[in-house]
């Protein structure tokens, strides 16, 4: 990646000559110990090969959770003394957090939540629903109007295709 970024690798020319080149960095690569360096080198490679321009964004980070990009755009980050997901899960496991509200979230290890009271709001019978003390049935994305930010950072709007079944409600 460093050689692509500095232009010494032949693939750098392939990228520079491409009509719409793109780098998509997975969030798993960023979770590594050297994740910040991977992100920096990928950004440098994108800049040096012309992937970032007014009419084209060829540098993207693929998130594992829906609308994470939108949340980041809005500044939804833990402030001073706040906790990220790992900190919340660890706090629940240690008994420092009594209530955990999962909005369609299942990418955490439910076995580590200790005795925290868990409310699950969502539309799948996933791991979060199986661990929950209370389940609030939610509408799927096809059952509600919604706005989200895609991987490229573009705002998109979806229209409801069907009504939610039973007691399911929109998340708000």
Regions found by a protein language model. Name each.
Residues 1-172:
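Non-catalytic alpha/beta scaffold blocks inside enzyme catalytic domains
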């Amino acid at each position: 990646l460093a050689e692509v970024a500095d232009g010494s690798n032949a693939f750098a020319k392939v990228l520079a000559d491409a009509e719409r080149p793109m780098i998509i960095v997975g969030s798993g690569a960023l979770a590594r110990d050297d994740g910040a360096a991977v992100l920096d080198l990928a950004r440098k490679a994108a800049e040096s090969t012309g992937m970032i321009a007014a009419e084209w964004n060829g540098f993207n980070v693929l998130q594992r959770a829906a609308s994470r990009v939108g949340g980041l755009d809005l500044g939804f980050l833990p402030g001073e003394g706040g906790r990220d997901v790992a900190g919340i899960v660890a706090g629940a496991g240690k008994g420092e957090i009594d209530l955990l509200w999962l909005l369609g979230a299942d990418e955490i290890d439910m076995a580590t939540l200790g005795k925290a009271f868990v409310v699950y709001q969502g539309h799948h019978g996933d791991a979060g629903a199986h661990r929950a003390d209370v389940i609030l049935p939610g509408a799927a994305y096809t059952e509600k109007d919604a706005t989200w930010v895609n991987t490229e950072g573009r705002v998109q709007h979806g229209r409801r295709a069907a009504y939610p079944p039973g007691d399911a409600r929109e998340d708000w």
